[in-house]
């Protein structure tokens, strides 16, 4: 049996055997003692093992094709965007694993800017990428940001969200992904630099520059504004991947104007105004168009990878409802299954839901709201009735012309007997 004291009755560490007066602190547990030196050694061992787990080894890092295949399971359509994101993310983490500086080449960070209408899958793509790579992920809204000294959030609060997502593990957070939404809302209000202060536009772009490029940021652990008597978390943003997204309404007109200037004159191809879809126009975006939109040159320069997304058409929205692993129809069917009920959506119902989302101009994001409106009453009713076997949603249910068709157990039995 282990003795916790020496011959003189002095307490000692159960692990290294050092006496109480030979160490700074001796912590008591149920039938055991541990000194501060052993605690420190244990912490070092744990940190070392965790840091090894954090490093995405080249063998473990998914290849661009593998990343694209996993994205396909969650995000419908947007093939070109998925390909571009897969390559950009692969190169980013390859750069981290191999070290930023080679003998002859310095690899720079490839932050991403995503352009696409509301509900086209920008946020979902960024979330899924973080899930694939098993890295911390944070979402921030650019509209809530202001430059330092004004009412609103400091840009450092974005980094705090990432640290919180990493359970305050700074090393883990330093390899995470940050998605900044509504980035188009911080565009400069006019093309010419303003004399007055634009605290939520150009000022925020200036404030974001350093963290996008890579800096040691001082992050207030409780959020809010900085004050001098506060302790800060030091976070290196060099290896954090920033993905900025926005709808950029009106950008297509800027691109059109640039293209039309080149296609004027003899021999120019004559095309109708509505011949080209907005998504096809956005694919021709250049950094100069983003500058004209109101982003400052330094900001555009720190987002070298430009990815464009298409508006989802009726066919794509129906696929969003039914195909992904987390498809809304599958989710509702699972919820009904838990109550012992089979849920069926008729094809015409899915088409009507998709058309309603297009009419509302909400894209895939609006599908959930439409389904909630349709399903609320029946989801309220079914748990209280134990004789329902099936619920059928038709086009007329979506259009509010009739109630969902509920089949009872008795009706089901009768059908089986007549068959």
Swiss-Prot record:
Domain ClpX-type ZB per the UniProt entry, residue ranges: 1-54
Keyword match Transcription regulation: no
Key words, A-Z: ATP-binding, Chaperone, Metal-binding, Nucleotide-binding, Zinc
Annotated ATP binding sites: 117-124
Example of a GO MF term: ATP binding
This protein's record includes keyword Metal-binding: yes
Binding residues for Zn(2+): 13, 16, 35, 38
GO cellular component, one term: HslUV protease complex
GO biological process: cell division; proteolysis involved in protein catabolic process
Role according to the record: ATP-dependent specificity component of the Clp protease. It directs the protease to specific substrates. Can perform chaperone functions in the absence of ClpP.
Protein family: Belongs to the ClpX chaperone family.
Complexes and interactors: Component of the ClpX-ClpP complex. Forms a hexameric ring that, in the presence of ATP, binds to fourteen ClpP subunits assembled into a disk-like structure with a central cavity, resembling the structure of eukaryotic proteasomes.
Protein name, UniProt field: ATP-dependent Clp protease ATP-binding subunit ClpX
Lineage: Bacteria, Bacillati, Bacillota, Clostridia, Moorellales
């Amino acid at each position: 049996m282990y003795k916790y004291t020496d011959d003189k009755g002095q307490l000692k560490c159960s692990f290294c055997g050092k006496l109480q007066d030979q160490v700074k602190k001796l912590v008591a547990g149920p039938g055991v003692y541990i000194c501060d030196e052993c605690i420190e050694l244990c912490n070092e061992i744990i940190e070392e093992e965790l840091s090894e787990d954090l490093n995405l080894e080249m063998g473990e890092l998914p290849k661009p094709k593998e990343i694209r295949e996993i994205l396909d399971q969650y995000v419908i359509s947007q093939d070109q965007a998925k390909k571009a994101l897969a390559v950009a993310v692969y190169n980013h983490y390859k750069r981290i694993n191999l070290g930023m500086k080679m003998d002859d080449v310095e690899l720079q960070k490839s932050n991403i800017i995503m352009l696409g209408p509301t509900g086209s899958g920008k946020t979902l793509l960024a979330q899924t990428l973080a899930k694939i790579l098993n890295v911390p992920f944070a979402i921030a809204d650019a509209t809530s940001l202001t430059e330092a000294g004004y009412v609103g959030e400091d840009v450092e609060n974005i980094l705090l969200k990432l640290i919180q997502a990493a359970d305050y593990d700074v090393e883990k957070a330093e390899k995470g992904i940050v998605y900044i939404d509504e980035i188009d809302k911080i565009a400069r209000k006019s093309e010419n630099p303003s004399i007055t202060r634009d605290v939520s536009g150009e000022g925020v772009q200036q404030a974001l520059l350093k963290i996008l490029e890579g800096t040691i940021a001082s992050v207030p652990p409780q959020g809010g504004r900085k004050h001098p008597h506060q302790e800060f978390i030091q976070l290196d943003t060099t290896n954090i991947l920033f993905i900025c997204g926005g709808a950029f309404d009106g950008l297509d007109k800027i691109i059109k104007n640039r293209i039309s200037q080149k296609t004027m004159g003899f021999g120019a191809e004559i095309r109708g105004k509505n011949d080209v879809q907005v998504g096809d126009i956005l694919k021709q975006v250049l950094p100069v168009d983003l500058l004209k939109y109101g982003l400052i040159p330094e900001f555009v320069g720190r987002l070298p990878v430009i990815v464009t997304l298409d508006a989802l058409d009726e066919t794509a929205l129906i696929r969003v409802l039914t195909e992904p692993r987390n498809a809304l129809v599958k989710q509702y069917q699972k919820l009904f299954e838990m109550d012992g009920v089979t849920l069926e959506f008729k094809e015409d119902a899915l088409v009507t839901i998709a058309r309603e989302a297009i009419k509302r101009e909400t894209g895939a994001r609006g599908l959930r709201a439409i389904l909630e409106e349709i399903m609320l009453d029946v989801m309220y009713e079914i748990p209280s009735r134990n004789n329902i076997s099936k619920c059928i949603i038709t086009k007329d249910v979506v259009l509010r012309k009739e109630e969902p068709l509920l089949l009872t157990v008795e009706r089901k039995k009768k059908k089986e007997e007549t068959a």
